[in-house]
């Protein structure tokens, strides 16, 4: 494998469908073979557009489940730079402030990059950069309960705001954009991030791509 190339794996699916869990499992298991500095994870959420020019009231009204809320062009540019052997500065996004922070996270070139995010498979330019893709096909009611627990506990949200957002944008955008993007996935994973067989299949695919 050329030292300036890298394998890009995308893990998509509904919010709280198990994307982070399967990404972490693969990261932890592959870094033992590749080394910690040779595998990295990029969360699509980091590429939510900067909204510092908007008031907090305006930021809250943003539809974060629509593809336009994300700067996929910047993500594509960063992936192309990483594939060509250059480091990039990944934005940092604040869920409480609903905008990017002043900080960035520098990522150096890797042999394996795992992308995780709800809308990754909706963008044809992003899909063209992927070596393999996964869709987490977890039932939507389970995703909602997980999201409710997570957002209240970890992201400073109220139960009422999470429920309201789910009804107004999360579920409609899942049906309009996220679920249809499943057709572009190479692997469809049922039963969430603890699906051991799916994890092993994906690891084997990554190892095969690295061996080329």
Curated annotation (Swiss-Prot):
Nucleotide-binding found in the keyword field: yes
Main location, first listed in the record: cytoplasm
Pathway listed: Pyrimidine metabolism; CTP biosynthesis via salvage pathway; CTP from cytidine: step 1/3; Pyrimidine metabolism; UMP biosynthesis via salvage pathway; UMP from uridine: step 1/1
Listed GO MF terms: ATP binding; cytidine kinase activity; uridine kinase activity
Alphabetic keyword roster: ATP-binding, Cytoplasm, Kinase, Nucleotide-binding, Transferase
One GO CC term, this protein: cytoplasm
Catalytic reaction list: uridine + ATP = UMP + ADP + H(+); cytidine + ATP = CMP + ADP + H(+)
Disulfide bond sites: none
InterPro entries: P-loop_NTPase, PRK/URK, Uridine_kinase, Uridine_kinase-like
A Gene Ontology biological process term: CTP salvage
Subcellular location: Cytoplasm
Record family assignment: Belongs to the uridine kinase family.
HAMAP family: Uridine_kinase
Protein known as: Uridine kinase
Source organism per UniProt: Shewanella baltica (strain OS155 / ATCC BAA-1091)
């Amino acid at each position: 494998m050329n030292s300036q190339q890298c394998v890009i794996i995308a893990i998509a699916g509904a919010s709280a469908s198990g994307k982070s869990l399967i990404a972490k499992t693969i990261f932890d298991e592959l870094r033992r073979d590749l080394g910690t500095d040779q595998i990295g994870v990029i969360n699509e959420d980091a590429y939510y557009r900067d909204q510092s020019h908007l008031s907090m009231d305006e930021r809250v009204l943003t539809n974060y489940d629509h593809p336009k809320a994300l700067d996929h062009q910047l993500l594509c540019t960063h992936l192309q730079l990483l594939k060509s052997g250059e480091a990039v500065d990944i934005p940092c996004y604040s869920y409480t402030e609903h905008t990017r922070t002043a900080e960035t996270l520098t990522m150096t070139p890797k042999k394996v990059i795992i992308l995780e995010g709800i809308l990754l498979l909706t963008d044809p330019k992003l899909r063209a950069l992927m070596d393999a893709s996964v869709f987490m096909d977890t039932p939507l009611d389970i995703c909602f309960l997980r999201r409710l627990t997570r957002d209240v506990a970890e992201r400073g949200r109220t139960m009422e705001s999470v429920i309201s957002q789910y009804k107004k944008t999360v579920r409609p955008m899942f049906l309009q954009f996220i679920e249809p993007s499943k057709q572009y996935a190479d692997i469809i994973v049922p039963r969430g991030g603890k699906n051991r067989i799916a994890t092993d299949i994906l690891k084997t695919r990554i190892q095969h791509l690295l061996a080329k």
